[in-house]
Every structure is written in structure tokens, then in C-alpha cells.
Amino acid sequence: SVVTSGVAGGIGTWKNYLSYSNIQWVEQGGNKLYVLASNSLYSYNRNDQSIRTYDKINGLSDMDIKFIGWNQAARRLVIVYSDNNIDLLDDKGNVRNVPDYYLKALTVNKTVNGIDMSGAFCYLSTGFGIVKLNVAKAEISDSYNLAFPVNYCYIEGNYIYAASESNGLYRAALSANLLDRSNWTSAGSYVVRSRTMAADLLAQAKTLNPGGPKSNTFIWTDFHNNRLYSTGGNFNPDANNWENPGVVQVLQGDDW
């Protein structure tokens, strides 16, 4: 959510107050921890113990983050948004937007189901196949239309594997023309991949306090006596949206 300068600071300025209460994923990149929480992003510098939040006001291109992943070879954090837009964040805080996939008009299902790193590349498993992102060059290198949804992918030996819950496991030799669907052959049954955060990174992330409200969902707000009162919620058990708890939040100064 965004509130105006009357609450947040100087006249004519804006400040985002995003929720970071629900930790979803933690990545380590150099001396920093990058934390995806409540679909928002912040980092923790282990050298000086500083916390930095990221949003559209201070550099990001979009909001509602779906996946993050650190690419060690390119020394960049890959940020994939729910609308399929992509940002690359380096360890100095510089952001490079890669909007090509987001802007590309396709008749297939573009939904990104997961991301996997190999060298300087990030492989996006999508609703139609795999998209290969060159993280170092900040460009889309290739797109492999397999005509089935891919849940996750990985490289092992001289092969790239595409795991699909609906179609099973497929693979192709890295030396083959991966654009040619006939080079992808069945390699077994689909196996659910369990992704768990490193316990030590999660434990440290739980000690951090980047601030912000409990929830990003605001149903009603009112400004009274230099305080911003708000109610969250919109919880729907049928939609299983537990990230929208019923809550009353009060902002005074910069503190919730």
C-alpha cells in the first residue's frame, strides 16, 4: 500500500508501506540475505546489520513478487513478478528490468511456475515450456515451447530436464536444437519436488524487522489525530487466501 506525504514525510513525497510479515523465501547473495515476504522484498546486510526494503518508489519495476533467486555467476537476484515481469537486482542495489517476456503477446499460458539457475542463466518453467534468461546480459536467450506445462526444470549431466505434473519427465541433450520439440523425449514419471528454505537463513530472517503493516490488503482507511487507521481482511476461506487476515492497523509517524 502507499500513503501520502501527510503521514509519511515531506510535502510532495510518497512512501510505500508494504507488508513483510509472511516469509516465503530467503536467498543468500554475497554478504546479503534477500527475503521474499508477503510478496514484497527486503535485504539484510550481514556486514553492517542494515535492512533495506525495495519497491517501485526506490527502483523496482513492478509489485507482487512471485519468485526470487540468486544467480551466483552473474551476481544478480532474479525477481519474477506475478504478471511475468522480470527485474534483476545486483549486489550494489542497481535494478535492470527485462520486460520482454512480460510484453510478448502469446496465445499460450505464460504463467511462471518456478525458476532454476544454471551458470549465468535462469530457466523459467512456464505454462507452455521453458524460457531461458541470460542473467549476465539481462536478456531472454531462448524459449522452448514444449506444448505442455512445466512445473520445474533442471540440468544434470549433458541434459536438460523438464518435469511436468500432467505430462511426466522429459529431457533433451544440451547439444541438441532445444527449439525442436522432437528432440525432447520422455524420461520417466513426474516427481514432486520439495523446496525448503535453508534452516539457518530462515532462522535469521525471522529475527529481522523491516517494519510495515501486517497485511497488504486494505479495505478501509481513516486519518484521525495524526494517525492512519486501517482495516485489512477480505479473507475468503473458499479462496484459501490466508494472507488476508482480519486485522486493525494503526500508523503513527513511520511506525505501525
Where are these regions (language model features)?
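Short, conserved, GDST-rich strand-edge loop motifs in beta-rich repeat architectures
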Residues: 230-246
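Bacterial Sec-dependent N-terminal signal peptides
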Residues: 1-13, 121, 159-161, 172
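Short loop/turn segments that connect beta-strands within beta-propeller blades
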Residues: 45-49, 90-94, 134-138, 174-177, ...
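Beta-propeller domains
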Residues: 36-56
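Structural signature of WD-repeat beta-propellers
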Residues: 36-38, 81-82, 90, 125-127, ...
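Short coil-to-beta transitions that initiate beta-strands within beta-rich domains
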Residues: 7-29, 55-73, 98-118, 141-157, ...
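Conserved beta-propeller blade signature
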Residues: 32-35, 76-79, 121-124, 159-162, ...
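Short glycine/acidic-enriched loop and turn motifs that connect beta-strands
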Residues: 41-42, 84-86, 129-131, 167-170, ...
